[in-house]
Each structure stands twice: as C-alpha cells, then as structure tokens.
Amino acid sequence: MASTGVAGPSFAVAVRAKRGDNTPMAAPLVHAGLEVLYTRDQIARRVAEMGEEISRDFAGQKVVLVGVLKGATIFLADLARCISLDATFDFLSTSSYGKGHQQSGEVKLLKDVDHSVEGQNIILVEDILDTGLTLSYLRRVLSAHQPKSLKIAALLDKPARRIQKIEGDYIGFTIPNKFVVGYGLDYAERYRNLPDICVIPPSALGDE
C-alpha cells in the first residue's frame, strides 16, 4: 500500500518511545479540588436535545445565534452543530463581574452585534442564567434592534440567585446555588477549558 505521507498516532508513539518519553499524548485534565457536576457526555446529550428542540420550533426558518462572550462560546459552537437550520452567528460582550467571583450589579455593554438583526429570529445564547441582570439587560439591547423573535438559550439555570424576573426558553440544566466552572465558565478567567462542568468549593473562592 502506498504511503499517505501522514504520520499517524502509532508513528508519534514510536518516536516518543525511542526518545524515552512515556508521557501520554493527551493527558486528561485534572479537576483538582473540584466536584464534577455534569460530565462531558451528559452535556453533549443535553445540548443535542436542545438543538433538536430549537430545530423543531423554527422549522423552515433562519435563526441568528447571538452568543455572550466569553462564557457562551463553547456552548454556542456545540449547540450550533446540533441545529438543523440555516443559522448565522453574532456576539455580544458585557461587563458585570468584579474582582474574583463578586458581581458588581451594574451591567455594561462592551460590544454590540456586528450585523443587522432586524426582522430576524434571534436566539440569545448564554452559559448561565444566574441573577438575571445580564440577560435582562441584553434582552432590552437586542429588542431595540427590532427582531422578528427573541428567545433565550442558557446551558445552566441557577434560580436561587435570581434578582431580575426572567426565564430562559431553552434550558440545559437547573443547578443548585453553587459556583460552577468548565465548558466555557470561568473563575478569574481560569477553568474555561475543562470539558466537564464542575463545582468550586466555597473555601477556594477568595477574591484574587
């Protein structure tokens, strides 16, 4: 058989072994001190279900997925691939968290959508529906663009923290009042790359 010219995994392992390097090629991320709340498999299944629901609700129509930076990026990417519709992306950015994990209570718009969404079906994609302050604010911002419809898709819902009365239209998981990270969610910009959603113990939540 002719060679493809591509060095596959077995070739890479052989080279590493020859060098005396026995380190695994893809070492698993260590959740040191963290409690896994939802595994990557549980997340994938639920996101697929959400995508199917959105596809049914907007069958035959176009949608614009508007993600909230930075936390919703991973969720939006996975959700989009589970939606069998003509979909485009855009992004918003806000500032609402202060130092560490403390929320300031004031929401500021750092970035609006780049393209016109007037007359479009918007799905506002967020990582977590928490106090409701950010999503209530962004709902007003997007409503001012005069869309055809506006729905909210949040991977997580933490109703115990709600300050502003608002509910999501598509919710992945309802969680207890614990600080969670992973799958895009962070603590002081850390842990976003964890594939699972994990709980940080209160003792670790010091202001940095």
Residue spans for each PLM region:
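PRPP-associated nucleotide enzymes
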Residues: 1-208
